[in-house]
Curated annotation (Swiss-Prot):
Protein name stated in the entry: tRNA pseudouridine synthase A
PANTHER family noted in UniProt: PSEUDOURIDYLATE SYNTHASE (PTHR11142), TRNA PSEUDOURIDINE SYNTHASE-LIKE 1 (PTHR11142:SF0)
Gene responsible for this protein: truA
Protein role: Formation of pseudouridine at positions 38, 39 and 40 in the anticodon stem and loop of transfer RNAs.
Coiled-coil portions: none
Example of a GO MF term: RNA binding
Length: 249
C-alpha cells in the first residue's frame, strides 16, 4: 500500500462536519466515495487531522489515505479534485511514509473566527461570518484574548459530553484584529490542539467581555475554576475556519 497526505479546503455550510455520519453528508464520506471510484470500486478509508463540526469551514485541513498502487501526485490531486463535489478543493497531495498519521503526528493547528458586525446584515455572508450587530469594545477583547495564551486547563471552555480526560492545551497565539472598515473582526488561535467547541466557547466569552457583560478578568476566573457555566455562550459555527495545520519535521 502507498500512503498519501493531502491538504484540502471545503465550504462547511452543506456538511454535517468532517467525520463520516450515518444519515448526513460529511466531507470524509464524499472524499472516500471519490477515491473508491478512482480505485475501481475498492473501498478507500480517509483519515482526517481534525474533526470540524457542522457548518465549520476549512482552508487547510489535512487528510491521509492508502492506495494499493503508486500514482503521480499531481495526476492524483487533479483526479481527486475534479471528481469531488464543488464544495471541496484538493490543494495538494504528497507521498508520505507508511507510518505517517495525519492525526497523531506531532502538529499544530491555526483557526480563524470571522465576525461581521455590519448593519444592516449582509445576507451573502451569512454562511461565512457570524453576525453580531451589538456594541463591542475591541480594546477590552484584545486584552482579554491574550490571557488565553500559554498552557492551561481549558475545562471551562469545553462543551459538555467530551470524552477527553486531559484538557490541558497550549495556545501559542491568540489575537484579534479589525479590518480597515471596522466591520469584520478576525480572531486567530494557534496551538497544539483544541477541545470540543473550545474556540467557539472562547469567542462567545470574548463577545460577552466586548459587550461589557463580563469583566476582562472573567478569563482568569474560568481558567482557575474550570467551570463551563462561568463562560459565555457557544458562538455560531459559520464564522469558524480551520486555517492551517503544521507538522514538525
Amino acid at each position: 500500500m502507498t500512503r498519501y497526505k493531502a491538504t484540502i479546503s471545503y465550504d462547511g455550510y452543506a456538511f454535517a462536519g468532517f467525520q463520516r455520519q450515518s444519515h448526513a453528508r460529511s466531507v470524509q464520506e464524499e472524499i472516500e466515495k471519490t477515491l473508491t471510484r478512482l480505485n475501481k470500486g475498492q473501498t478507500i478509508t480517509v483519515h482526517g487531522a481534525g474533526r470540524t463540526d457542522s457548518g465549520v469551514h476549512a482552508l487547510g485541513q489535512v487528510i491521509h489515505f492508502d492506495l494499493p498502487y503508486q500514482m503521480d501526485e499531481e495526476k492524483l490531486r487533479f483526479a481527486l479534485d475534479t471528481q469531488s463535489p464543488e464544495d471541496i478543493d484538493v490543494i495538494s497531495i504528497e507521498l508520505v511514509a507508511d507510518d505517517f498519521h495525519c492525526r497523531y503526528a506531532k502538529h499544530s493547528k491555526t483557526y480563524e473566527f470571522i465576525l461581521d458586525r455590519g448593519r444592516p446584515k449582509n445576507p451573502m455572508r451569512r454562511h461565512y461570518a457570524t453576525h453580531f450587530p451589538y456594541p463591542l469594545d475591541v480594546e477590552r477583547m484584545q486584552i482579554a484574548i491574550k490571557k488565553l495564551e500559554g498552557t492551561h486547563d481549558f475545562t471551562g471552555f469545553t462543551a459538555s459530553g467530551t470524552s477527553v480526560e486531559d484538557k490541558v492545551r497550549t495556545i501559542t497565539e491568540a489575537s484579534l484584529i479589525v479590518d480597515e472598515t471596522g466591520q469584520f473582526l478576525t480572531f486567530t488561535f494557534s496551538g497544539n490542539g483544541f477541545l470540543y467547541k473550545q474556540i467557539r466557547n472562547m469567542v462567545g466569552t470574548l463577545l460577552k467581555i466586548g459587550n461589557n457583560r463580563m469583566p476582562v478578568e472573567q478569563i482568569d476566573l474560568i481558567l482557575e475554576k474550570k467551570d463551563r457555566q462561568l463562560a459565555g455562550p457557544t458562538a455560531a459555527p459559520n464564522g469558524l475556519y480551520l486555517k492551517e495545520i503544521r507538522y514538525e519535521e
